[in-house]
Amino acid sequence: MGTVAFAAMGVASESAQAQSFAFGAGATFPQIVYRQLMDCMYDQAQGSSGKPGPLAKAANCGSFNTSGFHGMILYAPTGSGNGKSVLRANDKTLIGTPSSSAPPYTSANIGVSATADYDGVQFIGSDDVVNEADMTAWNTGGTTSPQSKFGNLIQIPAVIGAVAFGFNGKDGTGATLNILPATPTGGSSGLNLSRNAVCGIASGHITKWNNPILTALNGGALGTGNITFVHRTDGSGTTFLLTNALVEQCRYEFGPNNETDSTVVSYAFPWTDRAQSCSTPLVPRGANQVNWPDQFATNQCGTANANSGGGTFANASGSGALVSLVTTTNGAIGYASGDFWLPVKAGGLKTANIQSQWDITGATGKFQPPTFAGAQKALATAIPQFDATSRANPLTWSLQGVAPNPVVAGAYPIAGFSWIEMYQCYQTHSNTNNAYTWFKTWIDFVYGTGATGIFNENGFAQVPAVWQNEIYALFNDPANGPQGSGCSGKVGAY
């Protein structure tokens, strides 16, 4: 679908050859693969003084600027929550500061040495789906609301990825973990975590590396000392994907309170959504920021975040910083997309294999590594069922575009789409730069066959054809699809 659409963009692409630019911000989950896809389609981002330098060309990209159009897209990986705020305001000054380990998001050779130099913001990335609060914020405010100025909010899936658990490799005392099971095909270690183990660690009840549950799973004691669970502090779409899965998967898991207290307790994910209003009963649910006990002593209602199992938690802002903290903390385990760990990242930390619903129900004895193929199988269970009306509603895409507990053979159980959020109505800049055309041409490349290998080498999978069909149906809808030259009665975004 994407290949055909890209070929059909001939007129727009020819007009874009004058060399143009587009700018975005948001999710860190796909930051590396986005940079490589952008550099493959257009000119390579060079970075600038004091900022990350150029990123190596993807192995499955023939050369930089394969389109021959030159120009560039720059993307600042600042987290999904920040991206959403930037899009609503259409304000580049709200873009946060990316991690020092981020791919280049500036390019001094085109006069962009900081996000303050961006020529507007045309799109954002988010792994955290649009929710009702997002829609209320978009539609509220009368003539000053985003909807009144920029038209409808549009949300489309851009990539499929696994949320992988990377671990330090040493126990809490600094001794090398004693991992006995074989490494499965596509994995990077033999460390096996059942659903019960994952839920126990995340809820703070499995706190030691010699916990009997872990010992039984791995054919012997892994080590001793504390397990430190490292999480994100910022508004993170990766956290949404993790918590959306754990809320569903951990609901009926139970076990000992901790290694010294045999009282059986629930391992249901306990940490509540930080964004919920205090007037609403606080419940654990998939969210981009939750009330982790080390980050927030109390929730937004003033109630203490009780860590009854005594688990050890630590935190960092951004995927790169989280991985760095796991790397330097004995006994640590944390979560990020697969491209931050082995085998995708050379010299990276290893990842654990976890149990899927299929493996539990069928008693297969298998544990799934966080591969792009496993993530792709998980999202194959999310099939869109839209009509012309529901297709225009981002909440419909949110409802149908998640797979919190996939039940299919070979599926990796914590995976999801990373989304592009964009405007319906764009304006052509006074400097004649039509950023929407530039961005749309890149989107066509992302959905085409030429991008498949780039996704896969980074540990990601391409959005399946059934979703691409719906994306282009929306794009080709004259009433609800994006308009590159503005909409009647709308200021239009830039």
Residue spans of the language-model regions?
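Gram-negative bacterial Sec-dependent N-terminal signal peptides
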Residues: 1-17
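Flexible loop/hinge segments at secondary-structure junctions
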Residues: 18-494
